Amino acid sequence: MKRLPILLFCLISAIICSAQEIREGISAPESPADSVAAPRKRNIIQKVIDYFAHSNEDKSDKKFDISVIGGPSYSESTSLKIAALISGMYKSRHDSLTPRSDVSIYGQGSITGFYNFGIRGNHFFPQDKMRLVYDANFCHFPLKFWGIGYAQGANKANESDYTLLQSEVSLQLLFRLPHHIFIGPAAQFSYNRATKQERPDLWDGQGTRLFNYGMGFVLSVDTRDLPGNASTGYYIGLNQTFFPRFMGNDYTFSRTEVSAMYYHRFWASGIMAFRVHGAAAYGNPSWAMLPTLDAGNAVRGYYEGRYRDKNELDAVVEVRQHLYRRFGFVVWGGIGSVFEHFSQINRHTLLPTAGIGLRWEFKNRVNVRADFGVGKHSKSFSVGINEAF
C-alpha cells in the first residue's frame, strides 16, 4: 500500500511528460487535406493532458491566473489520501514592483477517516507597502500520540491512537520598512479536542478540549525572490505570540518562533537552501500548543507530532537540482531535537534527517513535491505543493 502513491505519482508524471514530448517532438506536418479538415473534438483525457502540458507557462500578464490540481497523495500520519487544490495568483497590471499575490483553497480526505479543508494565501498591497498573510483550516484527524518530551516520543511502547478535531485561524498584517524589513501585528485562534484516547495517561492530566486565543507581532527581513520557491535571497523572522488569561485561555503561556533561511544558486541549474529554526513555549502551555519537531516540512523522516516539548531546534541544508524539462530532484540532510532544558541536549537526543525527493513543475515556479525521508529508527513519504522551506 505504501508504494501505491509513488507508482501513481510516477505514472501520472510519465503520461504528462510523454504527452508533452509527443506534442512538441513528433507532430507531422499537415497535408493540404488536413489544413481544411474540421478540428477533431478532444475527449476528457486529451483535455486533461493538454491542461497539465501547458500549466507551467508564464501567465504573469493575466490579472488572475487560476489552476486546479488533484489526485492521490500520501503521508505517514494521514496514510493514502485524495487531495484537491484550487490555486490562484493575481496582481495589478499597472504595478510591476508588487509581487503576485496568491490564494489556495484546498480539501483532502483519506481512507483512515482523515479530512481537512481550508484557505491560505498572501495578499500584497500596491507597491508592496503591506502584506496580509492568512490561513484558516479545519480537520478531523485520526493520529498517534507518544506523550510529552523526547524520552516519551522515543519509547515505542507509548505509541497510541487518538482522534484530533482541530480548527485554526491565523492572521498577520505586515508593514514594509526600508531595507526589506517587515513588522506588524499577528493574531491566532485554535480549537483542539482529543477524543478516543487509547492511552489517556500520556496526557499527564491535561485538558482534552482546548481553546487558545493569541495576539502578538511578527518582525522579519525578507529578500527572497519568491517565498514559496525561492532561488535567491534570505529570510530572517521572529514570531512572538502571547496567550494571556484575560483573553479566555485556560493555559496561559507565550510562544517564540525564530527562522533563518538562505538560498543561493551555486550553478546554473542547482540551488542550495539552508534553514535554521527554533521554537520555545514559556509558562504553562498545553499539549496541543507545544513546539513539535518540524517533521511536516524541513525535518522529514518522522511522524509529525511524535516529538514535542517546550523547545525545538533544527537545521537543514537542501540541494535542489533541475533534471529534465519540468522535472527536478532534491537531496537534504539535517538534524533536530526537542527538549525542556538546554542541558538535556546530547548526542543521544539528536534526531537526524536525510532524504531525496522528486519535483514536477505544476505551474510556473510552483512545484509538486514527493519526498522520502529517513530519520532515527523512522522513515516517511509525503507529497505536497511548493518546497519544504
Predicted features and spans:
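Gram-negative/organellar outer-membrane beta-barrel architecture
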Residues: 58-68, 72-211, 367, 375-389
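Outer-membrane beta-barrel "beta-signal"
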Residues: 216-219, 355-363, 378-389
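Short loop/turn motifs that connect adjacent beta-strands in outer-membrane beta-barrel proteins
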Residues: 53-64, 92-100, 126-131, 179-180, ...
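Transmembrane beta-strand segments that form the barrel wall of outer-membrane beta-barrel proteins
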Residues: 65-74, 98-111, 117, 234-244, ...
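Outer membrane beta-barrel transmembrane domains
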Residues: 281-369
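Membrane-embedded beta-strand positions of outer-membrane beta-barrel proteins
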Residues: 68-70, 86, 105-107, 132-136, ...
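Extracellular loop and loop/strand-boundary signature of outer-membrane beta-barrel proteins
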Residues: 105-106, 154-159, 200-206, 242-248, ...
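C-terminal outer-membrane beta-barrel translocator/porin domains of Gram-negative envelope proteins
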Residues: 215-220, 224-322
